[in-house]
Amino acid sequence: MTAETIIELSGVEKRFGTLTAVRDLDLELVKGEFFSLLGPSGCGKTTALRMIAGFQEPSSGTIRIDGEDVSTVPANRRPTNMVFQSYAIFPHLDVGDNVGFGLHRSGLSRKERRARVSEALELVELGGYERRRANQLSGGQQQRVALARALVMRPKVLLLDEPLSALDKNLREAMQLELRRLQQSIGITFVMVTHDQYEAMTMSDRIGVMFNGQLEQVDTPQTLYASPGTRSVANFIGGMNFLPARLHNEGGGTLDMEIAGFGAMAVGRNPNVADHGRNALVGIRPEQLEIAAHRPEGYDSTVQCRVADIAFYGESIHYFVEVDGVPETMTVAVPNYFHSVDFTRGATAWLGVQAASVIDLGRNRDNETQQGEKT
Amino acid sequence: MKRLRRLLPGLGTYAALYLAFLYLPVLLLPLFSFSEGTIVAFPIKGFTLDWYAQLGEADTLLHSLANSVIVGGSTAVLSTVLGLFAARAYVRHRFFGREISEGIVMLPLVIPGIIVASSMLVLFLFLGLRPSLPAVILGHTFLTVPFAVSILKSAFDEFDPALEEAAYDLGETTIGVFRRVTMPIIGPGIVSSLLVTFTVSFDEFVLAFFLSGNRPTLPVYIWSQIRFPAKLPNTLALGSLLLAFSVLLLLTAEYFRRRAATGQGARKESRDDR
Ligand SMILES: Nc1ncnc2c1ncn2[C@@H]1O[C@H](COP(=O)(O)OP(=O)(O)O)[C@@H](O)[C@H]1O
Ligand SMILES: [Mg+2]
């Protein structure tokens, strides 16, 4: 990386007895970026974050923060601060004392401390809330106090463990944007843990996707969406139709494939995929498919389909369609342009797709079993 | 509950009678302690505070009161400290044998006092500890630990472990975390535990009778006085005071326990400047 590295994990592993919660984690974070660790519950995100914070010591590997090896430095002497999932607001202290808690040992005068506290509260738009009791705060306000309490310490890295999961949907969406704006304005590196793909995508510069203690891919949200390196990443981020394919020719930047149901297409090579093989797998995002009553013009491939089911989402409509030669039901997402649902269950329709929309997912690992199941 | 009530229409009456039977005699105690007569019988003759006044002059009574305070205070501190460790472990950690160990800690609540008392006497004599105040303190600690554990467990139940982590993360030392976060939040629970265990020890008779030797605690002293009919009114007065004092302590303890449960500890951090 050309930009300055702030956190460097190399070969970090955490074992609890026989369970390996985090496995061989290599990660470099850049100063000032908003980084998210994304993955299903139980995949080891929190454990990874807690090792960066210093609450847990890695079983092996090293952690460097700003060039210094902190692997054995306890949490109270690391230049990181954490926003807890439960916010952990001290119930016996008012907002001002909560936010000023960590300045106690800073050697600052009372006046300076008070200035820092009010500055931090301004930052999270809670200016003047110093004398509020902790139990008079709403969930969103507690979240802001927790943020201010961590930011007042001016950490090199702010760690957030599922910071928005306790908020209701509207507040959560508003806070996503606000947290992002805050991070950009203060320029501190944020590392957030979340299991919510949308949260990770809307907020982060880069996302690390984790499964079973293993970091599978680190990329920008756009790259993860357009060029996922594995089937599990493709499946976890956004919707995806998976199609088996045969790879005929891999010349240069394109792969000549015979895709189940859709026929021959030249698909762009996905640089994030580890290996290719004759049995290949491709993916098509639901919104990249066109559905029409008549054969649509100008597409690289068109096929007939039957509408098996319909789901109305308001802003979009999902058609679940069956295509001859495609083993699984496919999903087509159509924006709700004119408040009309154009197809009924059981109707026949046409699908159109561009080769540029087809994502190369490399060797198809469960091709063998699928062949076996075929009747 | 509704169905149960339909099945047993007399349940309410039964409950009322039960409570009356249980508590009316207790209420008679203070009533007769103000009576001029020396025998406990209706009708009550006149009103006097003499029996109370005479209490202040009884030397042995004051000594036994002092003994009880020493025993109660030591017991309260010991069992609360033990309870603190146990409760924290039970709430915070999942370890092998946790449930069995919890059951054993609670056992003194259901073992008959006379059995505990006689076996302790045997054990202490075997160990060379003669009946004395320290022996009573040990016995009472054993008896009151379950109270301390259950009160402190409810205090820890409400305590989010992330609070201590947050304080540590903000640069506090382990001791600082305990002083600035754990203590203020658990504090009311600790006070409640101290008060309850003190009260239980203060009122306990059987163990004290077996283990106190020649330094009686207050209940043992009262028992010794009941043999003298002339002293009965004084004993009633003393008993009434004891009753009032215990109720007061338990109410205070309950107040603190609730405060602990709702996290309404100390309001302000001391703003010490350096
Ligand atoms: N202190 C611990 N002791 C034993 N196992 C743990 C401990 N902390 C986490 N685990 C286990 O490690 C795995 C990963 O947990 P965690 O990091 O909390 O996952 P996530 O945050 O992604 O949901 C889980 O299987 C969890 O049960
Ligand atoms: Mg987690």
Residue ranges and their predicted role:
Chain A
Residues 34, 75-235:
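ABC ATPase nucleotide-binding domains
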Residues 38-40:
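The feature captures the beta-strand-to-loop junction immediately N-terminal to the Walker
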Residues 46-49, 145:
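ABC ATPase nucleotide-binding domain helices that frame the ATP-binding cleft
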Residues 53:
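Helix-to-loop junction immediately C-terminal to a conserved catalytic motif
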Residues 56-64:
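Conserved post-Walker A/P-loop segment of ABC ATPase nucleotide-binding domains
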Residues 62, 68, 214:
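ATP-binding/catalytic-site motifs of ATP-hydrolyzing domains
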Residues 240, 250-375:
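Non-catalytic connector elements of ABC transporters
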